[in-house]
Design a protein with these regions (language model features):
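C-terminal regulatory/oligomerization modules of transcriptional regulators
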Residues: 1-2, 115-143
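Pre-recognition alpha-helix immediately N-terminal to the DNA-recognition helix
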Residues: 27-34, 88, 99
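Canonical helix-turn-helix DNA-binding module
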Residues: 45-80, 84
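Short helix-capping/hinge SLiMs at alpha-helix to coil transitions
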Residues: 35-40
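Short helix-coil-helix linker/hinge
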Residues: 20-30, 83, 94
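Short, Lys/Arg-enriched N-terminal segment that forms or immediately precedes the first helix
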Residues: 6-21
Length: 143
């Protein structure tokens, strides 16, 4: 594949060029597990499925895949435990979500931009997120 930074790709091509093995769905699951862990001591498949509005069988498949990729530990009918890698990524996804929501709320003069954040959060790299955090802070200070 062409490694020229000025080369154009299809959307799928950019995804294939990504260094991370995480899909947007995997990111959503890790983010939700962190959110649930903030409220309760442990997470089970049914709670995860309910909060992501998916079937328990779909959640079970994704949790199994995340376990195989070493992001979490899970035994069938047991609790979900994040590995250190899973915890680091999950916490970053929470940060990314908050940065985007804060920026879009400031931009649109609103209190919540959940739908827009969910649609775009998977497509911005860490540098862009960090710069949006700085920009949002500066814009907030101007008010």
């Amino acid at each position: 594949m062409n490694n020229d930074e000025n080369a154009y790709f299809t959307f799928k091509g950019y995804q294939l060029n990504n260094d991370s093995n995480l899909t947007s769905s995997m990111e959503d699951y890790l983010e939700m597990i962190i959110r649930l862990k903030e409220k309760q001591p442990f997470v089970r498949i049914n709670e995860l499925a309910n909060n992501l509005n998916v079937r328990p069988s779909s959640a079970s498949k994704m949790v199994t895949k995340l376990s195989q990729e070493c992001f979490l530990e899970y035994q069938k009918y047991g609790i979900i435990t994040l590995t250190e890698l899973g915890k680091q990524w999950g916490e970053y996804f929470i940060y990314r979500h908050q940065v985007l929501n804060n920026f879009l709320c400031l931009l649109n003069n609103s209190h919540n931009e959940l739908e827009q954040v969910e649609k775009i959060e998977h497509f911005l790299n860490k540098k862009t997120i960090d710069n949006l955090a700085l920009l949002t802070k500066e814009l907030h200070n101007l008010q």
